[in-house]
Amino acid sequence: MNTNPIGANKTNETANNTWNENSAAEWFAKKEWKNGLLLEPHETTNKIIFAEQYHKNKTAWDKAFKFLGGNLEAKEPGKYEIDGDDVYAIITDQPSKEPEMAKWEAHEKFIDIQYVIKGEEKIGITPLSTATVSKPYDEANDYANYEAEGKSYTAKPGTFFLFFPDDVHRPNILVKGFEVVKKVVIKVRVAE
Protein backbone atom coordinates (compact mmCIF):
# COMPACT_ATOMS: atom_id res chain seq x y z
CA MET A 1 0.00 0.00 0.00
CA ASN A 2 1.34 3.43 -0.93
CA THR A 3 1.40 5.64 2.14
CA ASN A 4 3.26 8.46 0.43
CA PRO A 5 0.63 11.14 -0.35
CA ILE A 6 2.82 12.71 -3.02
CA GLY A 7 3.14 9.52 -5.07
CA ALA A 8 5.07 6.30 -5.31
CA ASN A 9 7.80 7.70 -7.55
CA LYS A 10 8.70 10.56 -5.24
CA THR A 11 11.06 10.37 -2.31
CA ASN A 12 10.59 12.60 0.71
CA GLU A 13 13.68 14.48 -0.40
CA THR A 14 12.29 15.26 -3.84
CA ALA A 15 8.76 15.80 -2.58
CA ASN A 16 10.06 18.50 -0.27
CA ASN A 17 12.16 20.01 -3.07
CA THR A 18 15.25 20.11 -0.87
CA TRP A 19 17.95 19.34 -3.38
CA ASN A 20 21.34 20.75 -2.49
CA GLU A 21 24.81 20.21 -3.89
CA ASN A 22 25.44 17.09 -1.78
CA SER A 23 22.07 15.39 -2.22
CA ALA A 24 22.04 16.10 -5.97
CA ALA A 25 25.61 14.85 -6.40
CA GLU A 26 24.79 11.67 -4.49
CA TRP A 27 21.64 11.03 -6.57
CA PHE A 28 23.53 11.82 -9.80
CA ALA A 29 26.42 9.48 -8.94
CA LYS A 30 24.08 6.52 -8.37
CA LYS A 31 23.09 6.82 -12.05
CA GLU A 32 19.72 5.12 -11.51
CA TRP A 33 18.26 7.86 -13.73
CA LYS A 34 20.24 6.40 -16.67
CA ASN A 35 18.07 3.23 -16.77
CA GLY A 36 20.80 1.37 -18.64
CA LEU A 37 21.85 4.29 -20.87
CA LEU A 38 25.49 3.69 -21.83
CA LEU A 39 26.27 7.32 -22.66
CA GLU A 40 27.71 9.68 -20.04
CA PRO A 41 26.62 13.22 -19.14
CA HIS A 42 29.21 15.94 -19.62
CA GLU A 43 30.99 17.25 -16.53
CA THR A 44 29.27 20.64 -16.93
CA THR A 45 25.84 19.22 -16.04
CA ASN A 46 24.12 21.23 -13.30
CA LYS A 47 23.30 18.36 -10.98
CA ILE A 48 20.91 20.30 -8.72
CA ILE A 49 18.71 21.55 -11.57
CA PHE A 50 18.88 18.16 -13.27
CA ALA A 51 17.75 16.38 -10.08
CA GLU A 52 14.89 18.86 -9.63
CA GLN A 53 13.72 18.59 -13.24
CA TYR A 54 14.11 14.81 -13.42
CA HIS A 55 12.03 14.22 -10.30
CA LYS A 56 9.34 16.68 -11.37
CA ASN A 57 8.86 14.80 -14.65
CA LYS A 58 10.55 11.40 -14.44
CA THR A 59 8.41 9.90 -17.21
CA ALA A 60 9.49 12.53 -19.75
CA TRP A 61 13.16 12.15 -18.86
CA ASP A 62 13.00 8.36 -18.99
CA LYS A 63 11.48 8.55 -22.48
CA ALA A 64 14.13 11.05 -23.59
CA PHE A 65 16.97 8.86 -22.33
CA LYS A 66 15.42 5.77 -23.93
CA PHE A 67 15.43 7.58 -27.29
CA LEU A 68 19.00 8.78 -26.68
CA GLY A 69 20.10 5.21 -26.02
CA GLY A 70 18.57 3.90 -29.24
CA ASN A 71 20.29 3.30 -32.57
CA LEU A 72 20.65 6.96 -33.54
CA GLU A 73 23.13 6.25 -36.33
CA ALA A 74 20.37 4.45 -38.24
CA LYS A 75 17.88 7.33 -37.91
CA GLU A 76 17.42 9.79 -40.74
CA PRO A 77 17.63 13.54 -40.12
CA GLY A 78 14.29 15.00 -39.07
CA LYS A 79 11.97 15.58 -36.15
CA TYR A 80 10.90 12.68 -33.93
CA GLU A 81 8.00 12.85 -31.49
CA ILE A 82 8.88 11.14 -28.21
CA ASP A 83 6.14 12.32 -25.83
CA GLY A 84 3.76 14.63 -27.65
CA ASP A 85 4.75 18.30 -27.43
CA ASP A 86 6.65 17.74 -24.17
CA VAL A 87 9.58 15.69 -25.47
CA TYR A 88 10.82 15.54 -29.04
CA ALA A 89 14.08 15.11 -30.92
CA ILE A 90 15.64 16.77 -33.93
CA ILE A 91 18.37 14.86 -35.75
CA THR A 92 20.62 16.80 -38.11
CA ASP A 93 23.49 15.80 -40.39
CA GLN A 94 25.04 19.06 -41.51
CA PRO A 95 28.20 21.16 -41.62
CA SER A 96 29.47 22.78 -38.44
CA LYS A 97 30.14 26.52 -38.34
CA GLU A 98 33.18 28.70 -37.98
CA PRO A 99 33.23 30.14 -34.44
CA GLU A 100 32.20 33.63 -35.55
CA MET A 101 29.10 32.18 -37.27
CA ALA A 102 27.89 30.13 -34.29
CA LYS A 103 25.47 32.01 -32.03
CA TRP A 104 25.03 31.92 -28.27
CA GLU A 105 21.49 30.86 -27.33
CA ALA A 106 19.30 29.89 -24.40
CA HIS A 107 15.77 28.55 -24.05
CA GLU A 108 12.98 29.15 -21.53
CA LYS A 109 10.41 26.41 -22.22
CA PHE A 110 12.65 23.47 -23.07
CA ILE A 111 15.82 21.86 -21.79
CA ASP A 112 18.28 20.63 -24.43
CA ILE A 113 19.94 17.24 -24.40
CA GLN A 114 22.59 17.60 -27.11
CA TYR A 115 24.53 14.61 -28.37
CA VAL A 116 26.95 14.22 -31.27
CA ILE A 117 26.16 10.90 -32.96
CA LYS A 118 28.98 11.04 -35.51
CA GLY A 119 31.88 13.49 -35.73
CA GLU A 120 32.97 16.20 -33.30
CA GLU A 121 32.06 19.81 -32.61
CA LYS A 122 32.88 22.43 -30.03
CA ILE A 123 30.17 23.74 -27.73
CA GLY A 124 30.55 26.95 -25.76
CA ILE A 125 28.89 27.27 -22.35
CA THR A 126 28.43 30.21 -19.99
CA PRO A 127 25.94 31.16 -17.25
CA LEU A 128 22.98 33.29 -18.32
CA SER A 129 23.98 35.85 -15.69
CA THR A 130 27.18 36.64 -17.63
CA ALA A 131 25.54 37.08 -21.05
CA THR A 132 23.94 40.09 -22.74
CA VAL A 133 20.85 39.67 -24.94
CA SER A 134 21.60 40.37 -28.62
CA LYS A 135 18.27 39.10 -29.99
CA PRO A 136 15.24 39.17 -27.67
CA TYR A 137 13.42 36.00 -26.73
CA ASP A 138 11.36 34.51 -29.56
CA GLU A 139 8.51 32.70 -27.79
CA ALA A 140 7.34 30.83 -30.88
CA ASN A 141 10.78 29.26 -31.38
CA ASP A 142 11.84 29.27 -27.70
CA TYR A 143 15.21 30.97 -27.92
CA ALA A 144 17.07 34.20 -27.40
CA ASN A 145 20.54 35.01 -28.71
CA TYR A 146 23.32 36.49 -26.61
CA GLU A 147 26.71 38.13 -26.69
CA ALA A 148 28.91 36.20 -24.31
CA GLU A 149 32.30 34.78 -23.48
CA GLY A 150 32.44 31.21 -22.28
CA LYS A 151 34.42 28.04 -22.10
CA SER A 152 34.40 25.63 -25.04
CA TYR A 153 34.21 21.85 -24.80
CA THR A 154 34.53 19.15 -27.41
CA ALA A 155 31.33 17.22 -28.05
CA LYS A 156 31.80 13.72 -29.47
CA PRO A 157 30.12 10.32 -29.33
CA GLY A 158 29.82 8.85 -25.85
CA THR A 159 29.01 12.06 -23.95
CA PHE A 160 25.85 14.18 -23.96
CA PHE A 161 25.31 17.75 -22.79
CA LEU A 162 22.35 19.07 -20.78
CA PHE A 163 21.43 22.75 -21.17
CA PHE A 164 18.91 24.25 -18.75
CA PRO A 165 17.33 27.73 -19.11
CA ASP A 166 20.23 29.32 -17.19
CA ASP A 167 22.82 27.75 -19.51
CA VAL A 168 23.71 29.93 -22.47
CA HIS A 169 25.32 27.68 -25.05
CA ARG A 170 26.91 27.98 -28.48
CA PRO A 171 26.77 24.63 -30.32
CA ASN A 172 27.82 23.59 -33.81
CA ILE A 173 31.34 25.05 -33.73
CA LEU A 174 33.66 23.52 -36.30
CA VAL A 175 36.39 21.08 -35.28
CA LYS A 176 38.86 20.65 -38.18
CA GLY A 177 38.56 17.21 -39.72
CA PHE A 178 34.89 16.94 -38.73
CA GLU A 179 33.23 19.41 -41.09
CA VAL A 180 29.93 17.49 -41.15
CA VAL A 181 28.40 16.35 -37.86
CA LYS A 182 25.41 14.14 -37.20
CA LYS A 183 23.76 15.07 -33.92
CA VAL A 184 20.54 14.92 -31.99
CA VAL A 185 18.95 17.61 -29.86
CA ILE A 186 16.27 16.24 -27.57
CA LYS A 187 13.92 18.88 -26.18
CA VAL A 188 12.39 18.21 -22.75
CA ARG A 189 9.78 20.68 -21.54
CA VAL A 190 10.77 22.51 -18.35
CA ALA A 191 8.68 21.23 -15.43
CA GLU A 192 7.21 23.92 -13.20
Predicted regions mapped to residue ranges:
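Bacterial Sec-dependent N-terminal signal peptides
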Residues: 1-19
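A short, N-terminal "cap"/entry segment at the start of jelly-roll beta-barrel domains
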Residues: 11, 21-91, 101
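Mid-length scaffold segments of soluble, non-membrane domains
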Residues: 73-135
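Generic beta-strand structural signal
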Residues: 109-113, 121, 151, 159, ...
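A short beta-strand-loop-beta hairpin characteristic of the jelly-roll/cupin
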Residues: 121-155
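Conserved metal-binding segment of the jelly-roll/cupin
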Residues: 154-172
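A short hydrophobic beta-strand segment most commonly corresponding to one strand
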Residues: 160-162, 178-192
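Short proline/glycine-enriched turn/loop segments at secondary-structure junctions
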Residues: 173-177
